[in-house]
Design a protein with these regions (language model features):
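Conserved G1/Walker A P-loop phosphate-binding module
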Residues: 1-69, 73-82
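C-terminal non-catalytic interaction/localization modules
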Residues: 2-7, 27, 31, 162, ...
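Canonical P-loop GTPase G-domain recognition
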Residues: 4, 168, 175-242
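Alpha-helical scaffold elements adjacent to nucleotide-binding pockets in ATP/GTP-utilizing enzyme cores
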Residues: 6, 17-25, 109, 149-153, ...
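A short hydrophobic beta-strand->loop->alpha-helix junction that borders the nucleotide-binding pocket
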Residues: 8, 38, 87, 117-119, ...
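Short catalytic/ligand-binding loop motif for oxyanion handling, primarily in non-cytosolic enzymes
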Residues: 14-15, 91-93, 123-125, 176-179, ...
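Switch II of P-loop NTPase G domains
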Residues: 59-114, 120-129
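Conserved C-terminal guanine-recognition region of P-loop GTPase G domains, centered on the G4
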Residues: 101-200
Length: 273
């Protein structure tokens, strides 16, 4: 059974930068989990990409769909392989284009969808308090072409009565957002994507990530929450297998439950007890 994660975001939303940062962090190991690209050439590409980022060079935006094959392990014991399908920003602007149709099919075939939102969308230049900030950003997002295209994609999928996979909404560059307004960001996303989030049977998680600052010469990465979107995605895949294993009374159910619990620990910083 194939495992697939599809990643979508507007141009320059930070998808490529996030991928490189996530890969370097996870390949080094986080909570005894480690990630590696199965293709050595992809590993080399991501390593070189991270080197450029660390030197203050911003990566070029993705201009075509890219697929990576990753392997995740715990204490060097295999957990799973999965495909990471990254689509270029702006692809939803042409719904009838073959690339857009391929995207829709990949969403339908995916175990998890990561929707990347550019943290710059949430930067205010005028707000003096939380209410002013929320009203300003809600208006800005309402008229953002990229966000509207994403909302329309969900509308088209719903017209086909398609059940969406778990969705992770990821705000990149969250260091640009004042700490006092971070909770308002969650509210803004919930209102913007209300029809997506308020369906009780749908699994949607909101996350904020950053590499720790603007990518300029001399940039020193200080990643925050960089592992959580990938942990959420892997957890969604494990849940798929757990349901199947329990239905078939498969002995692997205990194995899956063990790793599901371990991966859930990635979220303890976001949701402290």
């Amino acid at each position: 059974m194939d495992n697939k994660i599809t990643v979508l975001g507007v141009k320059e939303s930070g998808k490529t930068t996030y991928l490189a940062g996530m890969y370097i962090c996870m390949s080094a190991g986080v909570k005894n989990f480690s990630l590696v690209a199965k293709d050595p050439n992809q590993d080399m590409y991501l390593e070189k990409l991270w080197e450029k980022i660390s030197n203050g060079e911003k990566p070029y935006p993705t201009d075509k769909p890219e697929q990576y094959q990753f392997h995740i392990a715990h204490n060097y014991k295999p957990v799973m392989d999965f495909d990471w399908k990254d689509y270029p920003g702006g692809i939803l602007a042409e719904p009838s284009a073959p690339e857009c149709q391929n995207l829709i099919q990949d969403v339908k075939d995916s175990d998890c969808l990561l929707l990347i939102l550019d943290g710059r969308l949430f930067v205010s230049t005028r707000a003096q308090n939380r209410d002013e900030y929320k009203n300003e950003i809600l208006k800005k997002i309402k008229y953002d072409k990229g966000v509207r295209d994403e909302v329309k994609m969900f509308q088209r999928l719903s017209s086909e009565n398609f059940k969406l996979p778990p969705v992770g909404v990821v705000v990149t560059k969250c260091d640009l957002i004042p700490e006092a307004y971070q909770s308002a960001v969650q509210e803004i996303i919930r209102e913007t994507f209300a029809q997506l989030i308020e369906e009780s049977e749908r699994v949607v998680l909101l996350m904020s990530v950053t590499l720790g600052g603007d990518i300029v010469p001399g940039f020193v990465p200080d990643p925050f929450n960089i592992e959580q979107p990938i942990a959420f995605s892997v957890l969604a895949i494990l849940m798929k297998y757990l349901v199947l294993a329990k239905m078939q009374k498969d002995k692997n159910a205990n194995f899956i439950e063990k790793y599901s619990g371990l991966i859930f620990s990635f979220f303890t910083r976001m949701y402290p007890q």
